[in-house]
C-alpha cells in the first residue's frame, strides 16, 4: 500500500516552504518533495525578501533569517547607451522601526527556511522528482515520484514547483507556459570587501541599495536590469522575455556583459571577483496569464501559478502570500470537516482576489501587452529623456526657452504629436 499523508507539497521555494510550514505547524502530516540536492541548491543568486510577508508566517523572522542588507535606497535608471536619467529614494530606519525589504542569498535563505519547516514537523525528501499526479475519478489523490515504489497518496497536493510547473502541465491542470509570458534572467555574484561596497554605495552597517535599470540596455526587448548590494557581494543581472531573446537572436550572457560595460554600471563592479552565475525563468505574463489555481484535491501557488508583479519587480512576497493563503484555506476546510474538492477550494481563489496579490496584478494586467506592442518605451524615450536632460543641464549661452523648444521639437520629430498623446494615454491606462 502506498504511504499516505495529509498533504504533499511539491517544491521547497518560498511558496512551498510557507505552505508546508503552516500545515505542519497545525498538526498535519506533511510530505515536502524537492528536486534539488537541498532547498536552495538551484538558487545561488541574490534576491529581495519582503519582511512583512515572511513575518506574517514567522514572527521575529528578522532576528532569525539570514538576511544580507536592509534596503534603505532605491534607484531607478532609464538608460541609453552612455547615460541615464534616474530617480532615487533614500530613507532611514528610525528607532523602533523595522526595515521592510532585505537582500538575501537564496541558497542560504532557503536552507534556513527549510530547517524551520522540518522543525514544524514536515518530512522533507530532496533529490526527488514528481513525475506525475495520481488521479482517481478526476481527483488528485497523490503523486508518483522517480524513486522506486514512488507512489504516495495524500488528501491534498500543493503545487509549488516553479515557473514551468511540469507536474501541473503534464497532468493537464494548466497549459504550458508561453514564451511571451516568461522572462529569462541571468545573474552574477560579484565579490568585493565589505568596506568597498559600503564606500561605493554610500552606505554603512547593514544598510543596502537596489538599482533597477530600464531602456536601451535590453536592446529593444521587454526586460530590466538590476543590481543588489549584499554584505560582501553584489548581485547583478538582466532579464528579458524568452520570446524576445528568440526573435532577436541575442545571447542573455552577451546582454549581461554589455550592461556591465555601461559607464554607470562598470565603476560599481570594478575590481570584483565573479564566483557565481545563474539563470532563472520568471513568470511575467501577469494577471491574464494566471491559470486555474485550484481543483479536485489540489492547489497551486508561487511561480507555478504565475504570481509575479513584473511592474514593481515583486515575486517573493507574492510567493509567500499565495503559499500562506493556500495553507489557510486547507486548514479552514480541515477544521470544518469539509472535503478538498474544487467547490470548497474556491475559497483559495477568493482569498487571492481579496488580497493585494490579485488586486495589484489586476491593476497592471495590460502592461505586458502594452510593452510588447510599444517598444518605443524601451528605445526611443530613453534616448529622448537623456538628450533632454543633457540639453537642459548644459550651460552654453543658449536661453532656456530656446532649449525647451528644441526639446519639444525633438520629441515631436521622433514620435509625432499623435504618437506622444497616444503613448501617454497608453501609460495612463496601464497604471490606472
Name the predicted role of every residue range.
Residues 3-32:
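N-terminal Rossmann-like FAD-binding beta1-loop-alpha1 element of flavoenzymes
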Residues 10, 159, 300:
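Redox-cofactor binding/interface segments in oxidoreductases and associated redox assembly factors
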Residues 15, 38, 164:
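Conserved Rossmann-like nucleotide-cofactor binding loop
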Residues 26, 36-82:
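N-terminal FAD cofactor-binding segment of flavoenzymes
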Residues 95-115, 245-251:
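Short beta-strand to alpha-helix junction loop
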Residues 116-265:
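Predominantly flavin-linked oxidoreductase catalytic cores and closely associated redox partners
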Residues 218-222, 231, 244-325, 335, ...:
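FAD/FMN-dependent oxidoreductases across multiple families
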Residues 331-432:
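C-terminal helical "tail/cap" subdomain of flavin- and related membrane-associated enzymes
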